[in-house]
Swiss-Prot record:
Entries under InterPro entries matching the protein: Asp/hSer_DH_NAD-bd, Asp_DH, Asp_DH_prok, L-Asp_DH, NAD(P)-bd_dom_sf
Biological processes per GO annotation: NAD biosynthetic process
Other information: The iminoaspartate product is unstable in aqueous solution and can decompose to oxaloacetate and ammonia.
Keywords assigned by UniProt, alphabetized: NAD, NADP, Oxidoreductase, Pyridine nucleotide biosynthesis
Binding site for NAD(+): A123, N189
Name under which the protein is recorded: L-aspartate dehydrogenase 2
Function: Specifically catalyzes the NAD or NADP-dependent dehydrogenation of L-aspartate to iminoaspartate.
Protein source organism: Bordetella bronchiseptica (strain ATCC BAA-588 / NCTC 13252 / RB50) (Alcaligenes bronchisepticus)
The gene coding this protein: nadX2
Oxidoreductase recorded as keyword: yes
EC number from the UniProt entry: 1.4.1.21
A single MF term (Gene Ontology): NADP binding
């Protein structure tokens, strides 16, 4: 069976995912993308990914699955229409879901259209554990994001920090996951994913650190409850095309697509 998969956005993540799907002969796919600029299409995908004209064009193409990888604004613009039309979605820009009102509208749209929303793990691990403790009032979750200067180069000057002279680690934020995800939409989607899987946007605590000595994009997750403790530390290689995101993210999205299409899944 050939699956029809449409992307919203065709940046570093979506391009890597599209290439992975096209290389998988065991799971043939037809691909299309809704993107603001046709020049976004990498040469390797030219002629293999159809370019769509706005949300009407996407709906007319009738995909089996829509993969959003264009940023939080794209969710506000396109997700509700896709879901009401009955199109299952994978949402990569999970930070948008920190907005309770938007999340409620998307869930209502999915219910109206008979569609499903999936959020990939992305750069992190341990979501199954967080889901297991989600209902406990006595659970504590702390997440630390520690990234090198390259991941924050565009934002640091606005915080009064010179990225070229920063020699020591600096804490950029400490607070609840909701605020982290909405304040840093290009860097903290992970915070929203953790909170949605676990104990919520308010109780999930987030520390954001820029560290010139960081070996890569580092993620530390600590969970404590009477059920036990979990500590995870990941050191992900940054994406060659976008240092704000981990190279692993595209593979996580690809795995989520394969689970969505599969008859047999684990986890």
């Amino acid at each position: 069976m050939t699956h029809r998969i449409a992307f919203i956005g065709l940046g570093a993540i979506a391009s890597d995912v599209a290439a992975g799907l096209l290389a998988d002969a065991a799971q043939p796919c037809q691909l299309a993308a809704l993107t603001r600029n046709a020049a976004d299409l990498p040469p390797a995908l030219a002629g293999r990914v159809a370019l769509l004209d706005g949300l009407p064009g996407l709906l007319a193409w009738r995909p089996d699955l829509v993969v959003e990888a264009a940023g939080q604004q794209a969710i506000a613009e396109h997700a509700e229409g896709c879901l009401r039309a009955g199109l299952d979605m994978i949402i990569c820009s999970a930070g948008a879901l920190a907005d309770d009102a938007l999340r409620a509208r998307l869930i209502a749209a999915a219910e109206a259209g008979g569609a499903r929303i999936r959020v990939p793990a992305g750069a992190i691990a341990g979501l199954d554990y967080l889901q297991a403790v989600a209902g406990r009032d006595d659970a504590e979750v702390v997440y630390e994001s520690r990234k090198p200067v390259a991941a924050w180069r565009a934002e640091l000057p606005g915080m009064g920090i010179d990225p070229d002279t920063l020699a020591e680690s600096r804490t950029l934020f400490s607070g609840p996951a909701r605020e982290a995800a909405l304040r840093f939409p290009k860097n903290l989607n992970v915070a929203a994913t953790l909170a949605l899987a676990g104990i919520g946007m308010t109780r999930t605590r987030v520390e954001v650190v820029v560290d010139p000595r960081a070996r890569g994009n580092q993620h530390r997750i600590q969970v404590r409850s009477p059920l036990g403790e979990m500590q995870i530390e990941l050191v992900n290689a940054p994406s060659p095309a976008n240092p704000k995101t981990s190279w692993l993210v595209a593979q996580s999205v690809l795995a989520t697509i394969r689970r969505h299409l599969a008859r047999f899944t684990i986890g």
